[in-house]
Regions:
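Catalytic cores of Mg2+-dependent Asp-rich isoprenoid enzymes
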Residues: 1-155, 162, 167-311
Length: 311
């Protein structure tokens, strides 16, 4: 939780709010790592605005969105702080606008994701966009990296949703597609958590497993794009992906799944994931690379090629 628009120490924000990314950041080097931390802190402040952790946060989001829609990057304290990164890396206002759009979607009195297409669109807006922005910060000018970066962000967001079903329900949000859970309301999810063997609770458990299976498709695509990144970025993002994916693996193994204790990764798990990530470096050796699976983006037509051609 940031609680302030002024970002004086992005490294501290990353350390306290993004354990998986903070662990992976150490492999990026000084300049790239610091800029990645700045991008994370920027996105984190936007997220905390959406959650009301920053005073007048939703009002700030509306103001920022109005600036971005007009193609402006400035005239707001948060935007002003990151204008140098926009200039250096050519960050897309359209991509950031889609990120803010997703966070504004969360301002509804009750958030109810309709179906899988709606879910993927939401995940693109709040996480796939971050993948696109990170591509620029990690100094890759290879357009084929972009669709894979989007998919890695989506995979991580699906894991996040699976982990936070109960926490989101307490805030009046249901990100599990209504078509998967008989259009249960957040209140019904809360009630189901009290009786894990009820029909409703078992339906939610099945939906969480289905969500994590869907996430695997996006993680697989994300991994295929790592070889387009500079070598240190390849390794660092590979580590972050494996650490985040580990949360889903633990959820599947957990006896109390979505209604139990919130899943986190231990230091031992992070070390294990780091060792496994070294294997991904072999993908850098020349070999025929599979084209991107475009069916993963069937729902993303309204956002196609934001921030440049997607491969």
């Amino acid at each position: 939780m940031v609680q302030s628009i002024n970002i004086e120490n992005p490294e501290l924000i990353l350390a306290t709010s993004g354990e998986s990314f903070h662990w992976a950041r150490r492999f990026l080097g000084a300049k790239m790592g610091h800029d990645a931390a700045r991008l994370y802190s920027f996105c984190r402040v936007l997220d905390d605005m959406a959650d009301g952790d920053i005073q007048d946060g939703p009002e700030h989001l509306v103001e920022i969105q109005a600036k971005l829609i007009q193609g402006q990057w400035g005239n707001h304290p948060l935007l002003d702080q990151f204008s140098d990164m926009v200039d250096e890396y050519g960050l897309s206002t359209n991509v950031v606008s889609s990120l803010v759009e997703g966070l504004l979607d969360d301002q509804a009195d009750e958030v109810l994701i309709k179906d899988e297409a709606n879910l993927i669109q939401y995940a693109y807006k709040v996480a796939g966009t971050v993948g696109l922005l990170m591509c620029d910060v990690l100094n890759t000018d290879e357009p084929r990296a972009k669709p894979h970066a989007i998919d890695l962000g989506i995979g991580m967001q699906l894991t996040n949703i699976a982990r936070d079903v109960l926490e989101d329900a307490k805030m009046g949000r249901r990100y599990l597609p209504g078509t998967w859970v008989d259009n249960m309301t957040p209140q019904q999810i809360l009630e189901a958590s009290k009786n894990p063997y009820s029909h409703e609770a078992l339906l939610i458990t099945e939906a969480v497993h289905r969500l994590l299976s869907l996430a695997e498709d996006y993680y697989a695509s994300g991994r295929r794009g790592l070889a387009y990144l500079p070598v240190r970025a390849h390794f660092s993002i590979g580590v972050a992906a494996k650490v985040y994916r580990q949360i889903g693996i633990q959820l599947l193994k957990s006896k109390d799944s979505w209604y139990g204790q919130r899943q986190v990764t231990s230091k031992a798990s992070k070390v294990f994931c780091t060792l496994r990530a070294t294997m991904s470096l072999f993908r850098r050796f020349p070999h025929p690379r599979k084209p991107h699976n475009t069916t993963l983006h069937t729902s993303l037509a309204p956002y196609k090629n934001q921030g440049g051609i997607w491969g």
